[in-house]
């Protein structure tokens, strides 16, 4: 991974809150994972509002600036729209294209998005599991972010696997760990706990 450190620092400095110690630790762990030469398989576990989305955005930026595409898969349309808004606002000063797919986009819109993903014109896609039904192909996928994996059905988890072989995978969950680990199809090796509440 060839990270543009200057751009990354610029991106990080736009975070309007103070990072918690757990956030900093997790971001550093992800950075090490991405440079290790092995596909990352990390679970980030923390309560709602503890800053998992910012961690996902930093990981995305690292991959995007290295020339890879990113996909974030969410269980609900509401989450897709929420993440799309947050990511779009956070990335608006940088030259990356972000799109979304859920059941509310028209077939024509989906077709156009699929074509642009294949050509590498879209850098980051946020989608529900509709992505599996839409035969989406990426030009250069580097990172899969899975939001609340335990909300996906068995069939959807099986389909997730085919995206996975050489990609980095970051799974976010607010569910306490034991249940998540039992239900995890990915046999996750590395776990980051976000236990520090936000500073403000």
Task: Name these PLM-found stretches.
Residues 70, 98, 124, 143, ...:
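Hydrophobic/aliphatic anchor position in the core parallel beta-sheet
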Residues 78-116:
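Conserved helix-turn-beta segment of the N-terminal RecA-like "Helicase ATP-binding" lobe
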Residues 104-125, 132-141:
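Conserved motor-coupling elements within RecA-like helicase/translocase cores
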Residues 81, 138-200:
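Post-DEXD/H (motif II) to motif III coupling segment of the RecA-like Helicase ATP-binding lobe
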Residues 1-71:
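Pre-Walker A segment
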């Amino acid at each position: 991974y060839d990270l543009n450190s200057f751009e990354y620092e610029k991106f990080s400095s736009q975070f309007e809150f103070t990072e918690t110690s757990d956030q900093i630790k997790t971001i550093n762990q992800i950075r090490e994972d991405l440079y290790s030469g092995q596909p990352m398989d990390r679970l980030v576990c923390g309560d709602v509002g503890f800053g998992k989305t910012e961690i996902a955005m930093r990981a995305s930026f690292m991959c995007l600036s290295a020339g890879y595409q990113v996909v974030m898969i969410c269980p609900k349309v509401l989450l897709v729209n929420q993440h799309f808004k947050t990511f779009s606002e956070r990335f608006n000063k940088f030259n990356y294209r972000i799109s979304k797919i859920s059941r509310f986009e028209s077939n024509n819109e989906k077709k156009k998005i699929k074509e642009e993903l294949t050509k590498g014109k879209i850098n980051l896609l946020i989608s529900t599991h509709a992505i599996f039904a839409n035969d989406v192909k990426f030009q250069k996928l580097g990172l899969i972010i899975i939001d609340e994996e335990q909300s996906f059905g068995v069939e959807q988890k099986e389909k997730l696997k085919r995206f996975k072989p050489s990609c980095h995978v970051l799974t976010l969950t607010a569910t306490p760990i034991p249940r998540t680990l039992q239900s995890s199809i990915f046999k996750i090796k590395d776990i980051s706990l976000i236990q520090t509440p936000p500073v403000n």
